[in-house]
Amino acid sequence: TRKRNEILAKEIYLSVGRYKLRKKVRMIKKLHEAFKAAMERGVDLNDEQKRNGVFDQATFRVRYLDETPEQLHGTCIINLAKIQDPNDWGQIRGKKIATVFQDPMTSLNPIITIGKQITSVIMKHQDVSEVEARAQALELMEKVGIPNAEQRFDDYPFQYSGGMRQRIVIAIALSCRPKILICDEPTTALDVTIQAQILKLIKDLQKEYNYTIVFITHDLGVVANIADRVAVLYAGQIIEFANVEELFYDPRHPYTWALLSSLPQLAERNTKLFSITGTPPSLYNKIIGDPFAPRNQYCLKIDTLEEPPMFKVTDTHYAKTWLLDPRAPKTEKPEAIQNIHEKLLKAYNL
């Protein structure tokens, strides 16, 4: 029998809220595929042999922000690591799933040396001595591009630039060779030149460490540069899922159209920049129909009444919009994003 708040990864409903308010915020709804490393490496989800060692069994549960250990119910199993207590997350965090956050200025402890912050993670998850951990840390620092790693090992974070701090955060994240690297807007706080360097570093190290990247960003330029597959989210729902080429060449959801139309590179001289009218829906309220309907200039009557299913465009492309229903009127993409590939090449003088 499934326990309270226990849910399967095949269909995830994640709610975050507080008991006192008696409200639940629906953050991620109906994740239609199990969360597997295949997302970026292109593994056939139906191939049992290729799936082994990635996520053989995955069960996730809802966690409330104010939940105490006494209130925990259910279990979470990730790659056969059983989680029944908050302390058990130490088996997962850093070792199997690591995160690179968006602000390198606050990601590091300002009163602990850089070397100590790397070696402490290594020693927590690996049975190695301090000398061995130091050697691994120095090797990581060199791999992420820190010059004079031996001399900079005992420096404090304030002695590093923003780009160098983010390189150290990446080194810490990769210190235990995780299977999944979650990058939450890792280049937002950096200038454009450093952004490109950090993105290249993450992709280059992926080839060596063989990790899956889950990249969270609002920057479509970054998406085009780093992603293999893209999930477009709106109001906590995946509304379009496609290969990166399909998303830019043949987007199907009106929200994706609006996002692409908002690219400054597509704006013409002496014209207003495109913006999406209205505001996103409150996640405290139950959403009826398509959550994008109030802001959708292509809205159909059924959008306000019934939630659309995920329509299949190709074997790798799905979109959640009633416009793909065979009975829907034919709708053309906005003129701004027609031939978007050629327009972007022209904008960047390529």
Region spans (language model):
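A short, proline-enriched helix->beta-strand linker immediately N-terminal to the Walker B motif
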Residues: S175-K179
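ABC ATPase nucleotide-binding domain helical subdomain, centered on the C-loop/LSGGQ "ABC signature"
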Residues: A58-T59, D127, V131-I146, F153-D154, ...
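P-loop NTP-binding/switch modules centered on Walker-like glycine-rich loops
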Residues: I182-P186, L190-K272
